[in-house]
Amino acid sequence: MNIDPVALKIGLLEIRWYSLAYIIGILFAYWYVQKIDKYKVFTPESYKSIISWWVTGMILGGRIGYILFYNLNFYMSFPIEMFKLWKGGMSFHGASLGLFCTMYIFCKKYKIKFLSAIDLCLCAVPVGIFLGRIANFINGELYGKVTNTRFGMIFQNSGDFFYRHPSQLYEAFFEGLLLFVVMNLLFFFTKVKSYQGMLFSIFMIWYGIVRFFIEFVREPDVQVGYILFNWITMGQLLSFIMVILGICILRLSRMSHNI
């Protein structure tokens, strides 16, 4: 499989599929959150700057997370490379942490309930995950392990001609499309949204479990490999922590609702 990672080129300007995924995902989230914000969790004033907060949190968190979790030695040796975002190198777990941190500060500034705001935003986030994984697939990166199944595909970036799991598509479906459906069914057709932080916890647990198991068929990052027992990857460790935090948030959400 070999698709040009550049979606559009105008003179010297190149717009890559990955950048396009970010742009469309953020714009969709901005539109969708306003559409479903029936209880006015966000104020009209806060909507004017929320995109800049989202972008700051995701880019800083994603980049710092990738540096710390996946390639610290390289960036310590060549620190200038930290700023070359166009070369790639983003971490979903880092981007999530960055987004949660900036949203916490944002909510404090505009006097918005943090958990309610996160619950609302996470109803839209899976679409961004879906688009991001499709961009990974187009770029031929984050491909899976060698397989004999009929789902196997050849990725030129792997450096060989073995059939591999299209793990990006597995993630696009289970972490993106399916999670979007689940989150919104719960939001619109159950009383879950009355429990502040409940959707937050469900997102954390769902994503963490799905990512943990898909990592078994995803090729580990070559510079990291396996970090525990010769089968646990960094992505699995971070996803496990994500599940634990999700369970803690779930318990706190239920306790606070009962008080």
Swiss-Prot record:
GO MF annotations in UniProt: phosphatidylglycerol-prolipoprotein diacylglyceryl transferase activity
InterPro entries given in the database record: Lgt (IPR001640)
Membrane topology value: Multi-pass membrane protein
Pathway the protein takes part in: Protein modification; lipoprotein biosynthesis (diacylglyceryl transfer)
The keyword Transmembrane helix belongs to this UniProt entry's keyword annotation: yes
Transmembrane segments: 10-30, 50-70, 86-106, 112-132, 169-189, 197-217, 227-247
Primary subcellular site in the record, as a coarse category: membrane
Alphabetical UniProt keywords: Cell inner membrane, Cell membrane, Membrane, Transferase, Transmembrane, Transmembrane helix
Enzyme class: transferase
One example of a Gene Ontology biological process annotation: lipoprotein biosynthetic process
GO CC aspect terms: plasma membrane
Localization: Cell inner membrane
Enzyme Commission code(s) on record: 2.5.1.145
Residues the entry annotates as binding a 1,2-diacyl-sn-glycero-3-phospho-(1'-sn-glycerol): 133
Transferase listed as a keyword: yes
Superkingdom as given in the UniProt entry: Bacteria
Function: Catalyzes the transfer of the diacylglyceryl group from phosphatidylglycerol to the sulfhydryl group of the N-terminal cysteine of a prolipoprotein, the first step in the formation of mature lipoproteins.
Homology family: Belongs to the Lgt family.
HAMAP family xrefs: Lgt
This protein's name: Phosphatidylglycerol--prolipoprotein diacylglyceryl transferase
Organism: Ehrlichia ruminantium (strain Welgevonden)
Lineage: Bacteria, Pseudomonadati, Pseudomonadota, Alphaproteobacteria, Rickettsiales
